[in-house]
């Protein structure tokens, strides 16, 4: 049975969505094409009808995951700056976010894989980082734009770093301490301006 153009596009979108979750959960090298396509409800043979390579899919999945995360941050940042930053930090460093890698922050889940990737994927990732910084900068209390930029860079580094470390340790107590300390530091720094 011939697949319609609309169905082919829907299949492609499903593959990208599933890949975004599986790549965040298992890394780019932690999932093979068979498992990925099976999770999307399709056969491996159809993969190359949609993508030239797994790298192409990784770029698209990374971009989509970063955009979804960014949209959520933008929703949270619609509040007054101090309230928005508290909401963003609270969500980002929550137990729920820490435990759900597949639906969580693409920066924290994929940074290690992207560091070993080629320039195209690094460019996609960098665009995502820049977009997150644009959300954070207005939430900082610094006077000059350069100061707010520096605060946003430090805040993003602390948030992502704390999430990465808290997912990597065995102890739930240490995981919580890492996230609590980073959150307190980000909020203190932003308020000090």
Please place each PLM-identified region on the residue numbering:
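N-terminal intrinsically disordered/low-complexity leader segments
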Residues: 1-10, 193
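Hydrophobic alpha-helical connector segments
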Residues: 60, 74-104, 142
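Helix-turn-helix
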Residues: 14, 18-56, 60
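Amphipathic alpha-helical packing segments from all-alpha helical-bundle domains
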Residues: 67-70, 74-76, 86, 103, ...
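Hydrophobic/aromatic-rich alpha-helical bundle segments in the mid-to-C-terminal region
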Residues: 118-127, 140-193
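Helix-loop "lid/cap" segments that line or gate small-molecule binding pockets
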Residues: 93-97, 107-116
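A general structural signal for well-ordered alpha-helical segments in protein cores
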Residues: 85, 104-108, 152, 162
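Short amphipathic alpha-helix in the helical subdomain of ABC transporter nucleotide-binding domains
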Residues: 8, 81, 85, 148-155
């Amino acid at each position: 049975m011939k697949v319609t153009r609309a169905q082919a596009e829907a299949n492609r979108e499903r593959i990208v969505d599933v890949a975004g979750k599986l790549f965040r959960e298992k890394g780019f090298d932690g999932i093979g094409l068979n498992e990925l396509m099976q999770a999307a409800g399709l056969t491996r043979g159809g993969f190359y009808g949609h993508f030239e390579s797994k790298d192409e899919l990784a770029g698209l999945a990374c971009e989509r995951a970063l955009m979804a995360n960014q949209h959520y941050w933008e929703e949270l940042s619609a509040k007054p700056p101090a309230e928005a930053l508290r909401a963003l930090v609270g969500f980002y460093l929550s137990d729920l976010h820490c435990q759900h890698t597949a639906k969580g922050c693409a920066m924290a889940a994929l940074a290690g894989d992207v560091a070993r990737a080629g320039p195209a994927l690094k460019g996609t990732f960098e665009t995502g980082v820049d977009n997150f910084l644009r959300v954070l900068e207005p939430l900082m209390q610094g006077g000059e734009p350069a100061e707010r930029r520096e605060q946003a860079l430090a805040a993003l580094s602390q948030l992502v770093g704390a999430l990465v470390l808290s997912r990597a340790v065995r102890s739930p107590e240490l995981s919580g301490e890492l996230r609590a300390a980073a959150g307190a530091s980000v909020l203190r720094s932003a308020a000090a301006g």
